[in-house]
Amino acid sequence: MSPPRDRVDAYYKDNFQFKNTRVVLNKEQLLIERPCMLLTVLFVMFLSLVGLLAIAGIRLHRAAVNTAKINNDLTTSIDITKSIEYQVKDVLTPLFKIIGDEVGLRTPQRFTDLTKFISDKIKFLNPDKEYDFRDINWCINPPERIKIDYDQYCAHTAAEDLITMLVNSSLTGTTVPRTSLVNLGRNCTGPTTTKGQFSNISLTLSGIYSGRGYNISSMITITGKGMYGSTYLVGKYNQRARRPSKVWHQDYRVFEVGIIRELGVGTPGFHMTNYLELPRQPELETCMLALGESKLAALCLADSPVALHYGRVGDDNKIRFVKLGVWASPADRDTLATLSAIDPTLDGLYITTHRGIIAAGTAIWAVPVTRTDDQVKMGKCRLEACRDRPPPFCNSTDWEPLEAGRIPAYGVLTIKLGLADEPKVDIISEFGPLITHDSGMDLYTSFDGTKYWLTTPPLQNSALGTVNTLVLEPSLKISPNILTLPIRSGGGDCYIPTYLSDRADDDVKLSSNLVILPSRDLQYVSATYDISRVEHAIVYHIYSTGRLSSYYYPFKLPIKGDPVSLQIECFPWDRKLWCHHFCSVVDSGTGEQVTHIGVVGIKITCNGK
């Protein structure tokens, strides 16, 4: 084996070498040529770099241009998509719905109406029974070639619809936001302060007559849902007469109806919009009112009991029926009404000043009546009520039925107010808590609308007023609610009003009617004429059965004397309770009868600790 050196220096046929060859380098030449080569290489590299940068810039520019173009295309596509969405959602969808309604609902209905019209016309031309030409459909589609005098009825119907629309628009703008449920002192857990505010600003005919010095008497005022109605007697005389022989005097019965609105002074005011003035007649002596559904209804008759006969009524018993819309129209009525006594047990009707309601096109009132079966059904109740320490009504001679030993029942009078309805008064009756005086009965609708509140006013220094419930369906029923006492030995349904002790308050000279307030819990107001102060006052008493609380506010009167009548009506307005009063007094100095009319606002605030 040869040594390594020999292996290194060995000759291989694949390595072409010249043995013993000597290479001589020219160092000077290398020193000159090397920088030039380096510069050339660097220049070439620089040019390559510039070229690469140029290529990159061109590509970047193209990419930016393409990106901008793509963004524009995307924006355009989005706009087109939104436009398509708008067309589908806001144009095509309602259009499809309209087409669907037309095809699926209206077209069949039109075919049905057309079929009905053809059928009605055939029936009209070939009637099998007497046709009612007062059908409102003939106002819309009158028959051809048939002469029918239907213009007046159609005009009345259109007038009532227009009045309803006007009333609703007026109440929406002026009264409805201000009227609400009464909830006086709801957050008070301790002492309270009651403050009052008086206002006599109004736009009523009674205000004009009072300003002229005319004598106003027997005023009744009722309110409801932003409306008011009233009736009264007024005596007019010629103020310009120079000689006493030329002075004339004429009495009238006046009916007013209107809305309650803000008159610019921060207090509610009555704004009369329609009225009726009739010369005083015997059948207009006593009137009872009902308000609702944009109209006022009244029944009036002579100041005497009405004798009822089964199936008919006497010719001498004239009942006047008046209907006024909040705005005057041809639908207003003033006519005589017939009394339908369909109950053979009814034999007497006793009407005083009563407040009714209007519901479902019908006016409703509650009044005392007498029945031939009173002793059979209520004789034991009266006997037990008068056994120990009999109340004053047991021996009363102030009211005809009590003096005759009769036991009055509750009668409900109804009259339909539709244009096609005849002015006929229907009567139904039923017994309930004993009726002990004839100071009137008032009806109010309860909060839930399932029943009515029936109130009787207090009897001066004798008995408290009562609040009963009245239900019409399925049959008439009157049940006690508050301020009545049960007579245990008198049977299951034997109740009498709460009578006061023998120690009467001599300072209380007169009591008013009892007013139910619109509230969830039963709240009511009554007033008394009080002479305990230097200035005589109307004292308002406010009761809340839900919280077992009561409040009072004395309103000082500018007049003084012996009271003749006191009538109030209350309604909520701007978080206050406002009560309208009509007070008639025989003046202590002159002996003449004077009146005071106005509205008192009552606000109850909590006293801070």
From Swiss-Prot:
Residues 1-34 are intravirion. One of its GO terms (cellular component) is virion membrane. It is a single-pass type II membrane protein. Residues 59-609 are virion surface. It is found in: Virion membrane; Host membrane. GO terms for biological process: symbiont entry into host cell; virion attachment to host cell. This is Hemagglutinin glycoprotein. It comes from Rinderpest virus (strain RBOK). The lineage of its organism: Viruses, Riboviria, Orthornavirae, Negarnaviricota, Haploviricotina. The gene is H.
